[in-house]
C-alpha cells in the first residue's frame, strides 16, 4: 500500500473537520465519517485520535441514555474549534 504524503493527510483532516462542522451539533460515529470521506475506518480513527490530541475534536463515549459505548466511538467538533470555524464562516 503506498504511503500517503503529509499534505494529503492534512487535506483529509480538513475534510473530517469540515464534515463535523456541517453536521454539528450532532456527533457522528467513526464509520459514518469514514464513509463520508471515502476512507477505511482504521485510517479515519487514527486521524481522529490525532485531531483529538490537538483538541480539535472531542470523543463522545456515552449514548443519549448515558450508557458507555463498549466498542463504538462518536466524534464531534470541540467547542473551541467550532467557534473558530463559525467565525470564519461569517
What is each residue range found by the language model?
Residues 52-64:
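A short, conserved structural fragment
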Residues 1-17:
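Short alpha-helical segments that sit at the start of domains
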Residues 21-25:
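Short helix-capping/hinge SLiMs at alpha-helix to coil transitions
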Residues 61-73:
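Short, Lys/Arg-rich nucleic-acid/phosphate-binding segment
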Residues 9-10, 26-27, 41:
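Alpha-helix N-cap/helix-initiation sites
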Residues 39-53:
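Short amphipathic alpha-helical interaction segments
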Residues 76-90:
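Short, amphipathic alpha-helical interaction segments positioned at domain boundaries
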Amino acid at each position: 500500500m503506498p504511503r500517503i504524503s503529509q499534505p494529503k493527510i492534512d487535506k483529509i483532516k480538513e475534510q473530517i473537520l469540515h464534515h463535523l462542522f456541517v453536521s454539528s451539533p450532532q456527533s457522528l460515529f467513526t464509520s459514518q465519517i469514514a464513509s463520508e470521506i471515502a476512507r477505511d475506518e482504521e485510517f479515519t480513527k487514527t486521524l481522529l485520535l490525532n485531531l483529538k490530541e490537538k483538541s480539535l475534536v472531542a470523543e463522545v463515549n456515552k449514548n443519549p441514555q448515558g450508557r458507555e459505548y463498549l466498542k463504538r466511538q462518536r466524534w464531534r467538533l470541540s467547542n473551541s474549534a467550532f467557534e473558530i470555524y463559525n467565525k470564519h464562516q461569517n
